[in-house]
């Protein structure tokens, strides 16, 4: 039998591209990777230990980790963890049982210098409810002599005293994290945790959003009920897109919401964030795997009479995965890039496109999702472990049902353009071709306004490629829509006059239609802070061919102005300028923000002559840069339109002061969120230029003599970076300015002290009633 080979790593853990036999790796002291799997019993607070065989090369006859093993060359971490547990103990678990809690570097020499172990260990925790009966294990005798359960604190004491019966681990060093994590979950102060969740919830002001349906026919109202049902399915898909165990966590929290006050708070805050990670706390986890769903797995071990089987907690990582559920969690950029280089142009387009998920062949049988398993039966031939699956396949059970609802709704509605949108979107869900349905969305001219499908890419923090599903349903405000025609009509004029070298300007900008709606329902990727407007589609081909359209959510903006911006201005804006903060300026800048998503560089030419897009070149920093661009260029655009006599001069001062107040609103979303990050960049840049002034009473004002030049300067810098596709320059700019500076910290602390809400949490009773 050939000797097992390992991937040789650098001292920092990256693959070198070299693999060597196991014996040579330990002889030469090469860095390599392994997995540690700990089984923790929740009810007894015990860890499962294995007794290493007397024939082992290292630490023979000593008690050790539940299961451990090397990652063979070409294998993945998760697959290795699952395989080692099954081979050594006879325990077979799906991937959602494994929680990767940290990576531990072990550097030691044993056997008189003959065995050098330089090993990066991916440490996994498997949480089970009750002990597995000892007779249910199937031990691999050449590796494991016995197993036993030990209380975790008792085991920690053995290790700290360097008891010779146990394989040594430095519990006062990095490996102490294991025991810290378990202790935090076991020693919960229910009252303190409830108070913490209450404070987090209080940052959202509850609002009810409705609109009059009197102008909709009876058939349109019936269709609306079907559309809301389709929108509910967008929620189901989005939960899946966030993380593989997220749907199970949602169902578990909902089912147990009435068990206690704490359980109700968990559910309430989860429904706002749609995940265990808090949007307003830079995605810090407010739940742990200990709060997650319990799953019964009767076939995980040998069957034992009288024992129903293994029950485990569906795991999720403490740190929000940057690739969400779009990529394998252990995939890095280098692996993706190497795979991409071996694909045809058509395959590359699919892999980097909006509407596909990247998976591993080696983990196909580990996926806990039934619908995914059916999608992996016909894997395309390739030497790579990675492959892509279109949304229309991986989410087919969801999309098939949503498609049926939209098809029926389209049959009912009276508006020809809405009928076309609903029918084309129903087809797109099943074909994965969204171009025609997005054109139909841009051409929509209906009292009932619908946006549904995969659009935004904020959740993909690795590349910014993959789109999440969302829905916005509203009733068009015809008067407000007519009032805003000015902005769409002047989009080309704005593009031609951007503070940007002509070589980077777009030559084919068309007027962007603007629709103003009263929102009556949203779903999918609408977690945390609520959007007040959106500019779609994001597909560069459509932007190039047709431009974009924007939708303004007027009742959402009014709610935010009343509940958030006015109270913020009272605290942060100087007394002399406070009265300049008004809704019209806030609303008008939001319009310009969305308009400016449609101008500036999108499809670009690189120095080597290749055609690309800003999104693909800037990758994970694109979202923050694009939001900053839309904000600051939007402010520039307002002043430009005023100078041209197209807007009233009376709003010059109010638009700048309202923008300043709005900075504090957005930065409170956190610096991991694209809008908050983009706003911090703008605030700190303008403050550095003297355009914003900080006073002794901890309030701010605008220096009207400096603000116009500073806005134009920042607009030029961001637009130029986008025009060049210069990711390095974008990263440097964000790193310099996306910080909480002293004055900014003071303002945020003052807002926290008086408990001004950070955002709103809407409910939609009208839409819910229609659906039911």
UniProtKB/Swiss-Prot annotation:
Its cofactor is Mg(2+); Mn(2+). InterPro entries: NUDIX_hydrolase-like_dom_sf, NUDIX_hydrolase_dom, Peptidase_M49. It comes from the Eukaryota. Keywords: Hydrolase, Magnesium, Manganese, Metal-binding. Residues 30-172 form the Nudix hydrolase domain. One of its GO terms (molecular function) is phosphatase activity. Gene3D superfamilies: 3.30.540.30, Nucleoside Triphosphate Pyrophosphohydrolase. Expressed in roots, stems and, at lower level, leaves. A motif (Nudix box) lies at residues 69-90. Its EC number is 3.6.1.-. Mg(2+) binds at residues 84, 88. This is Nudix hydrolase 3. The lineage of its organism: Eukaryota, Viridiplantae, Streptophyta, Embryophyta, Tracheophyta.
